[in-house]
Amino acid sequence: MSANKVEAVLIDEETLDLHELASACAVPPTWVVERVEAGLLACDSAAGEMRFASAHLVRARRMVTTERCFDANQEVAALVADLIEEVEQLRRQVHAAAKRSRG
């Protein structure tokens, strides 16, 4: 695991364009376009321009890390991102249920 840990604040109202997302992930824009076209990374298209929410940035970074660290193909990287997102959702549900049972 890398000693360089990046912390980010998610701002749901802010979106990134294709080049901003690619730059934030340290990948070429073609990397992003390939994954969008394959249905592995979602985007919002307004007036023909790709826009990415903060959740898309988190997913893209996970996919980049998985591809680089484990020499995984894009489909495996997307599956790993799906599983991480599912675990996070389940943890939120367990936490919410625990709060309700205490209160």
Regions found by a protein language model. Name each.
Residues S2-S23, P29-V33, E37-G103:
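Arg/Lys-rich, alpha-helical DNA-contact motif
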